[in-house]
Amino acid sequence: MTEKLGILAIGHGSKLPYNKEVVTQIANYIAQKHSDVVVRAGFMENSEPTLEEAIEGFSGTGVTKISAVPVFLASGVHITKDIPEILSLDKEGCGILEIDGKEVPLCYAKPLGADELIAELVFKRVQESL
């Protein structure tokens, strides 16, 4: 069986539309660069789709495994407690989703964290501000 990866990009959500736009655009960039991957964005609060709705968005896509990646810089309560509970993850950060009547394994990625790519982006923003 051929593997088909799904990516669930998880955003915090906000009453302001810009937060949703940023996370959705990041998901779109991933999808454009990796056309063989199914990418969906979902949000914790104040934005739609919710995580549950985003997971439903994998229906009919044929994904065989999903990576849930929080589009957050650092860990906090949402990362360590809320998202794992919503996704029914075990202590290793893995779980099973039912999509189209099939069990699909789910793995939970780390937040963005401290990374040279983030540092370069910060420096780019500094240069743009000058």
UniProtKB/Swiss-Prot annotation:
S-S bridge residues: none
Pathway note: Cofactor biosynthesis; adenosylcobalamin biosynthesis; cob(II)yrinate a,c-diamide from sirohydrochlorin (anaerobic route): step 1/10
Record keywords, A-Z: Cobalamin biosynthesis, Cobalt, Lyase, Metal-binding, Methanogenesis, Nickel
UniProt binding sites for Ni(2+): H12, H78
UniProt GO BP: anaerobic cobalamin biosynthetic process; methanogenesis
Reactions the enzyme catalyzes: Co-sirohydrochlorin + 2 H(+) = sirohydrochlorin + Co(2+); Ni-sirohydrochlorin + 2 H(+) = sirohydrochlorin + Ni(2+)
Binding-site residues for Co(2+), renumbered to this chain: H12, H78
EC class name: lyase
MF (Gene Ontology): cobalt ion binding; nickel cation binding; sirohydrochlorin cobaltochelatase activity
Active site per UniProt: H12
Protein residues bound to substrate: E48, L73, A74, S75, G76, V77, H78
EC number in record: 4.99.1.3, 4.99.1.11
Family classification: Belongs to the CbiX family. CbiXS subfamily.
Subunit structure: Homotetramer; dimer of dimers.
Record function comment: Catalyzes the insertion of Co(2+) into sirohydrochlorin as part of the anaerobic pathway to cobalamin biosynthesis. Involved in the biosynthesis of the unique nickel-containing tetrapyrrole coenzyme F430, the prosthetic group of methyl-coenzyme M reductase (MCR), which plays a key role in methanogenesis and anaerobic methane oxidation. Catalyzes the insertion of Ni(2+) into sirohydrochlorin to yield Ni-sirohydrochlorin.
Name the UniProt record assigns to this protein: Sirohydrochlorin cobaltochelatase
Organism of provenance: Methanosarcina mazei (strain ATCC BAA-159 / DSM 3647 / Goe1 / Go1 / JCM 11833 / OCM 88)
Encoding gene, per UniProt annotation: cbiX
